[in-house]
């Protein structure tokens, strides 16, 4: 038999990953594509999702604010890809970033540390990448039929709350119980 080396992933409390995905909804009977913001806390496996008409600076901010309210606090460190909403320029062969003014304001207001993935290395935030797919398949299938985005977002937030009641395989508590450790970190 062949042995394969592996590394157990260690997930620290108080860390988050952010990404956007896209899905189809029926808004007043019309099929529309929406952007959805996802913030994941890998330690507790807690997730927050909100849908917006598009991905832009305002929805990036609003997604953060709503997620912080839902989680009951601000993660100490958040990992991102190199979204133009946060990064205006990648410098020194990808080792440094020039941040947008809007992102610097968000960061200085909420006082979290940031981390950006290496260019074309989405696997560095693999938890949220996987969750974007999970959310698309489990929250947006079948295609939600809603009168407005407020109703959709209320439904998405309710689903996120329901997810907190689930127990993670190999863990002794629910996601909500592990979220308490995330909050204290």
Range-by-range predicted roles:
Residues 86-90:
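Short, solvent-exposed loop/turn segments at secondary-structure junctions
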Residues 132-185:
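Active-site-proximal acidic segments at structured loop/helix or strand boundaries
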Residues 2-9:
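Short, small-residue-biased leader/transition segments that mark boundaries at the very start
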Residues 49-77, 96:
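Active-site beta-loop-alpha junctions of metal-dependent nucleic acid enzymes
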